[in-house]
A protein has these predicted regions:
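Nucleotide-activated donor-binding/catalytic signature segment of Leloir-type glycosyltransferases, i.e.
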Residues: 4, 13-38
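A short, well-ordered alpha-helix in the C-terminal region of glycosyltransferases
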Residues: 21, 102, 109, 116-131, ...
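Active-site donor-sugar recognition loop in glycosyltransferases
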Residues: 36, 54-58, 77-81
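Short alpha-helical segment that forms part of, or immediately flanks, the ligand-binding pocket
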Residues: 38, 60-71, 82-84
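Acidic donor-binding loop of glycosyltransferase active sites
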Residues: 41-58, 71
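Conserved acidic donor-binding loop of glycosyltransferase catalytic domains
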Residues: 49-51, 74-78, 95-96
Length: 149
């Protein structure tokens, strides 16, 4: 298993040091432009929507990119709305944020089951095309706002 972490956050230095100390197979890639990020996601076997418990997001914008990759998603977000979507639409698995043992168990389960990864990835891609396509979703938002004015 190799872990690639895209983006940066306030804990990056601490996490890089921890990965070095543990000799963990983790590579911190930092900020990636959209094209590079999409390429990394497509090259992955599993994507992880990693959020801390205190995150207030409901459905973050990166979700559409994760789903479009056609890979299964492990979600650590706590939004009941999105956790239900993950389960109902069947494109991934939910894990409680900040529970590394549970995260490792779910990643191992997916790593050992390529057919499940393929099924979940295809479901995620279908959700992305149906609900996260900016050409149609942005137009729907504009129309909604026009109707409110």
């Amino acid at each position: 298993v190799k872990v690639k972490i895209l983006g940066a956050g306030p804990d990056r230095q601490r996490l890089e040091e921890l990965a070095r100390q543990e000799n963990a197979p983790v590579e911190f890639l930092g900020y990636q432009d959209h094209g590079s990020m999409a390429a990394w996601l497509r090259a992955s076997d599993i994507t992880v929507n990693s959020l801390v418990k205190s995150a207030v997001q409901s459905i973050v914008t990166k979700i559409g990119d994760y789903l479009a990759s056609g890979k299964p998603m492990v979600n650590t977000g706590s939004s009941p709305e999105f956790r239900n979507k993950v389960t109902t639409d069947g494109f991934g698995l939910n894990v409680v944020a900040e529970n590394p043992e549970a995260l490792a168990d779910v990643l191992e389960e997916l790593a050992r089951n390529p057919s499940l990864r393929k099924i979940m990835g295809a479901r995620g891609r279908a959700v992305a095309e149906r609900e996260f396509d900016q050409r149609t979703s942005y137009l729907a938002i504009v129309n909604l706002l026009r109707n409110l004015i």
